[in-house]
Amino acid sequence: MNDILREIGMIARALDSISNIEFKDLDLTRGQYLYLVRIYENPGIIQEKLAEMIKVDRTTAARAIKKLEMQGFIQKLPDEQNKKIKKLFPTEKGKKVYPLLRREGEHSTEVALSGFTSEEKETISALLHRVRKNIERDWEYVKKGNKRDY
């Protein structure tokens, strides 16, 4: 039973390593593709929401966003109502690589779930969603500087 999170971690690290290798030619490394995909799918998202969506701290998100911006994959544009708020958008370069990133994600999902019935796919999706929701409570708690009691 204790091996479940280890299995999830191994799967996540393996998929991340595969993506980092395959996207190296695009100069997308260290999970930057995750940010680019979310920005493409949520144009105008703000940095804080993106960090929350990916489940990273603001500093980690800021570094990745800065690098993507310097590489020309995304741009920050001021909000029309509040110029202090910067919204994130993919550039033409970012839009151009998105289909490849999407295909890789679909392929990885297909490989990961090969041999599963439709019912099993629905079940694993529902169970993982519940696991994520459980972990999100702790994430929100410790993010505020609290310590879990274990």
Swiss-Prot record:
Name the keywords, alphabetized: DNA-binding, Transcription, Transcription regulation
Signal peptide positions are none
Query: For this protein, what is any one GO molecular function term?
Result: DNA-binding transcription factor activity
HTH marR-type domain spans which residues? 1-133
Q: Which InterPro entries match?
A: HTH_MarR-typ, Tscrpt_reg_MarR-type_CS, WH-like_DNA-bd_sf, WH_DNA-bd_sf
**PANTHER family attached here?**
MARR FAMILY REGULATORY PROTEIN, TRANSCRIPTIONAL REGULATOR, MARR
Protein's UniProt name: Uncharacterized HTH-type transcriptional regulator YybA
Supply the source organism for this entry. Bacillus subtilis (strain 168)
Q: Which gene does this sequence derive from?
A: yybA
